[in-house]
Amino acid sequence: FYFPEAILSYQTASHYDPEHPMPYWGLAHAMGPNPNSRYARMPDDPKGEGLKAINSALSRIQNATPIEAELIRALHVLYDKESISDDAKRDQAYLAAMRELNRRYPDHSDIAALYASAYMSIGRWDYWDSEGNPKAETMAVAEALEHIMATDLSNPGVLHLHIHLICLLYTSPSPRDWLQ
């Protein structure tokens, strides 16, 4: 979640393993939109470096595992302005791709975290309706994260994003439900 360090780490990884696609995927992920950048209305990929990185990952996709290839294709949707020019529609398409990956790989902690992040980028800290009830996808994301947490507490992304979901529990009509 510290993007400058993540970018430096992925750049270093791409130097040591230039033919593996995942360092480039990581660069694109770190350079791209995230819940905080969307909330602050920062421009997406203003210098085009994220697009360049995801295209580099795509050009090396033959070196990826099947799950890595699916993650690369999913993230490409977020950058593919030629196919979907509207930012909000691209966000929704990326969320749909991550929702599907989470459905297919419910025990994969990184996919659960990426699904949550995709949802939070769209929600921009708005996960509850005007009456304090969680929106439908808020519960689905919470359940995906909690499914992972039931057996594995080692993924910091899962834990971090779960905290963001429950930090707003005070607006819920039944906060005790979240504390169980």
Located regions from the model:
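Amphipathic alpha-helical repeat scaffolds of TPR domains
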Residues: 21-34, 64-82, 108-128, 153-164
